[in-house]
Amino acid sequence: MPRLILASTSPWRRALLEKLTIPFECAAPDVDETPMPGEAPRQLVLRLAQAKAQSLAARFPNHLIIGSDQICVLDGEITGKPLTEEKARQQLAKASGNIVTFYTGLALYNSASGHLQTEVEPFDVHFRHLSEAEIDDYVRKEHPLHCAGSFKSEGLGIALFERLEGRDPNTLIGLPLIALCQMLRREGFNPLQQ
């Protein structure tokens, strides 16, 4: 049975995969994440998830390698990590009363057989109308400077929302576990029987 590799150093993705109680290792992929000119959000996350998984194939030649990438889209534009408090406040003000869509690309690459499975999972976050004071308080308390969209749904960010829509709530944090379990089963690796 091939061993499992998570092509990520994200503590959030690691924590999500740990929910499945299956043994795995993490390794940092070496991938240029720059979008290509005219690349649509779905294409971008799919390409990057695949590239992350396949970038580790030489190091891990008999493994199942999981790659994942996520972007946040508001009004048709990719919204990145804010990096500053001012930018975080601007992003949250723009999201207020609107729908933010997260696209998470998932790839499972069998480095022994060369078999690749991919999927893109969308997840919609409906923001409630936020006051300037609420935005300021949230940014001060949660400090979401390294989170796409300027919020952490697994923390206080849940108080910003009116509704969440998607097949798998884990998708919003960065790793669609329902889709991953389906892919693993197609490779003969059932998380319930490990």
Swiss-Prot record:
State the family named in the UniProt similarity comment for this chain.
Belongs to the Maf family. YceF subfamily.
This protein's species is: Salmonella typhimurium (strain LT2 / SGSC1412 / ATCC 700720)
Q: Which gene is annotated as encoding this protein in its UniProt record?
A: yceF
> NCBIfam families under this entry?
maf
GO MF, one annotated term: nucleoside triphosphate diphosphatase activity
Identify the PANTHER family for this entry: 7-METHYL-GTP PYROPHOSPHATASE, BIFUNCTIONAL DTTP/UTP PYROPHOSPHATASE/METHYLTRANSFERASE PROTEIN-RELATED
For this UniProt record, the keywords arranged alphabetically read as follows: Cytoplasm, Hydrolase, Nucleotide metabolism
- Mind listing the GO biological process terms from this record? nucleotide metabolic process
Put simply, this protein is called 7-methyl-GTP pyrophosphatase
Where, per UniProt, does this protein localize? Cytoplasm
Q: State the needed cofactors, names only.
A: a divalent metal cation
Q: What is the lineage of its organism?
A: Bacteria, Pseudomonadati, Pseudomonadota, Gammaproteobacteria, Enterobacterales
**What's its top-level EC category?**
hydrolase
Q: Where is this site: Important for substrate specificity?
A: 12, 70, 154
Q: What does this protein do?
A: Nucleoside triphosphate pyrophosphatase that hydrolyzes 7-methyl-GTP (m(7)GTP). May have a dual role in cell division arrest and in preventing the incorporation of modified nucleotides into cellular nucleic acids.
